């Protein structure tokens, strides 16, 4: 996408001049003030002046894009901490930039890093021998709704190259469930190289791990403290009393609460508004820095180009921001693979490779919980078979084949697939996925998509988030925590938790939080090792998957009977989840 910033800005300035002339002709006057946007509390303003790559262990040795380590550092081994058990805020920022950049972009030379893209590649696409550091100032703030549980983090980055004569702002909501630096390698890098201010935000997600055992939290700067010691800088703590927490720990020790899951905010409904708030704060920051007594608000939506752009959930946040932008802040949207929660499958069509596809128009929770039931079985089908040894063939790589076959057996016993053996049952499972919306091009992708945890993680996280359930609810007998090599919940290693702001991605991907099925036969286990009570075998916790599906559909996943007050899950739980899903659908009015 090519954006002509000059032509758009000229039109905006002309309209501003016309509006001013009309007001003057009518005898009106304007006395603009630079007001802090509602709900926003500034936390810090820090200069990151580095232009030469180094260790990046202090603010003075860091820049906005690479944390001071440059193109070479982003492509190298993880930067070390002086004290791994007690990383500093500066070290955590550096490593968060490192992990978030690499978490979205291919950092391998053969993948194009350093030649097609990367800090050393200019905005015009020229490959340089430099390290690509971008010095400037970063303004961190928190957006809250008064509850103390929303706590959306915003980081406005203003490069020293910001052009006051041609102002532009790029809004970068984090992809996935990532923290505030989640879009640094996508929208962030593009905007900084263009000399734009960049407004990064976690959009209400982020790495917020609350340790139920010791009442510790992440602070806004990524360091850890007790809830009390963190005070107003607390990023997230579960809304639970000490007495309730003690009782919970006695039954379910070594568990973690996750911000996106347990904030009881349904943050997805606010992704668009949070992205808009980041944009408004960016305008405030620019005016606060460059405004004068004679002209306190030199930058306005009328003379500043504002682009919202990101990928995945960040792309959805960008679309949501454009839908909710009644004030004309945003000029353009760049959304890569956005999670598009459609309200209907009617009135439009979708083609793939020139051919019409079926099964579209469903929500993320619908697709995810359906796939979570059938994918491990379908991965064994002949049409999905692979012989390669790679991450792509993860079920075979890590020895999950027997458990996947057990999933096929369990589905057959419950009448959810047909066939006399694994070959027939897995083919039926694959056919069901195709009929539900997955194309044959996805046949071999079910293997890694499921076995790496996408289905179990999203099916555990999103329904709980939509339903606004507290951590102690253990919906569908599911919780979250660190686990050992056999999948049993254990205490998080102190250094792991201390570094988690920089290593975790806001989900239950095992770094360090994992999806735990509490009623696995023999004791609570991570989803990979779970033994379902109804089958008595290790089948990736089929019972939990069926329960999570029922939360989304409102009916028993085996019998099709409507949920009741005594069923698992209950009707009330499903009603809450479906109400939350209704809050996140888009309307397409940009």
Enumerate the predicted regions with their spans:
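N-terminal secretory signal peptides that target proteins for export/translocation
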Residues: 1-9
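Sec-dependent signal peptide recognition
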Residues: 9-16
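Bacterial Sec-dependent N-terminal signal peptides
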Residues: 16, 20-40
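C-terminal His-loop and adjacent cap/lid subdomain of alpha/beta-hydrolase
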Residues: 32-590
């Amino acid at each position: 996408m090519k954006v002509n910033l000059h032509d758009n800005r000229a039109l905006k300035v002309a309209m501003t001049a016309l509006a001013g002339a009309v007001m003057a002709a009518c005898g009106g006057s304007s006395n603009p003030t630079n007001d802090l946007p509602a709900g926003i509390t500034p936390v810090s303003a820090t200069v990151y002046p580095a232009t030469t790559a180094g260790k990046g262990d202090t603010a003075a040795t860091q820049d906005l894009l690479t944390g001071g380590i440059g193109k070479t550092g982003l492509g190298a081994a993880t930067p070390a901490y002086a004290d791994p058990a007690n990383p500093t805020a500066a070290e955590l920022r550096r490593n968060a930039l490192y992990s978030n950049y690499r978490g979205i972009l291919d950092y391998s030379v053969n993948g194009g890093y350093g030649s097609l893209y990367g800090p050393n590649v200019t905005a015009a696409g020229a490959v340089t021998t430099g390290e690509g550091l971008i010095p400037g100032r970063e303004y961190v703030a928190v957006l809250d709704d008064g509850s103390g549980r929303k706590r959306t983090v915003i980081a406005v980055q203003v490069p020293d190259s910001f052009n006051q004569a041609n102002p532009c702002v790029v809004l970068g909501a984090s992809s996935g469930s990532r923290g505030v630096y989640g879009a640094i390698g996508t929208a962030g890098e593009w905007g900084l190289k263009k000399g734009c201010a960049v407004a990064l935000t976690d959009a209400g997600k982020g790495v917020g791990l609350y340790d139920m055992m010791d009442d510790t939290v992440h602070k806004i700067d990524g360091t850890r403290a007790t809830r009390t010691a963190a005070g107003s800088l607390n990023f997230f703590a579960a809304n639970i009393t000490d007495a309730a927490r003690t009782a919970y720990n006695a039954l379910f020790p070594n568990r973690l609460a996750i911000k996106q899951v347990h904030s009881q905010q349904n943050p997805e409904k606010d992704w668009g508004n949070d992205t808009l708030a980041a944009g408004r704060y960016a305008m405030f920051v620019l005016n606060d820095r460059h405004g004068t007594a004679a002209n306190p608000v030199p930058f306005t939506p009328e003379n500043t180009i504002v682009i919202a752009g990101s990928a995945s959930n960040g792309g959805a946040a960008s679309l949501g921001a454009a839908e909710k932008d009644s004030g004309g802040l945003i000029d353009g949207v760049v959304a890569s693979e956005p999670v598009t929660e459609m309200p209907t499958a009617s009135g439009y069509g979708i083609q793939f490779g020139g051919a019409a596809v079926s099964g579209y128009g469903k929500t993320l929770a619908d697709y995810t919980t359906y796939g979570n039931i059938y994918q491990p079985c379908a991965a064994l089908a002949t049409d999905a078979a692979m012989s390669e040894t790679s991450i792509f063939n993860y079920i075979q790589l890590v020895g999950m084949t027997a458990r996947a076959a057990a999933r096929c057996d369990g589905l057959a016993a419950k009448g959810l697939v047909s066939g006399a053996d694994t070959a027939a049952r897995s083919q039926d499972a694959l056919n069901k996925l195709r009929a539900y919306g997955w194309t044959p091009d996805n046949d071999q992708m079910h293997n890694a998509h499921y076995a790496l945890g996408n289905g179990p993680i999203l099916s555990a996280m999103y329904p709980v988030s939509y339903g606004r359930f507290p951590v102690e609810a253990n919906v569908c007998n599911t919780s979250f925590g660190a686990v050992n090599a056999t999948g049993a919940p254990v205490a998080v290693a102190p250094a792991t938790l201390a570094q988690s702001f920089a290593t975790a991605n806001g989900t239950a991907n095992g770094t360090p939080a994992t999806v735990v099925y509490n009623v696995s036969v023999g004791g609570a286990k991570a989803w990979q090792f779970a033994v379902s009570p109804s089958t008595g075998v290790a089948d990736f916790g089929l019972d939990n998957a069926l329960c999570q599906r029922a939360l989304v559909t409102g009916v028993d996943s085996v019998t099709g009977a409507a949920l009741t007050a005594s069923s698992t899950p209950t009707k009330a739980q499903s009603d809450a989840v479906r109400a939350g899903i209704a809050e996140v659908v888009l309307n397409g009015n940009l």
